[in-house]
Amino acid sequence: MRLYPAASQMGRRSVEESVIDGYVVPAGAQVILAPWVTHRHPDHWEQPDRFDPDRFLPEREKERHRYAWYPFGGGPRACIGQHFSMLESVLALGALLRDFEFEAVDRGVRLGQGITLQVRSPMRVRLTPRG
């Protein structure tokens, strides 16, 4: 969800005029947030393209800016189902990893943009039942 967020961009409207890095963003302006970019930004992530689940250990999360990772948006317009989604993902992944070994068959993934991020090339995986 960090490297491949379902929503690679989301729109918001600025509530008040702001200056960001010398640019004036007027009140009411449409602003596009890009988790795809933020989640890979080296200011927030050391070796951003490397998969490292330890980044999300509680002691390391404290070091990170609150909005360096926002796959469900943030603030009052954050996805209402984010906690359910995280719980369901962990349970499903845990059950699959308990019962199967995974091996990638296809290398490299072609992605496309729609309302959500989409896989445009095969992403086959070989599953072998565990013991």
What do these predicted ranges mean?
Residues R60-W69:
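Active-site-adjacent bridging/hinge elements
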Residues S121-G131:
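C-terminal domain-closing interface element
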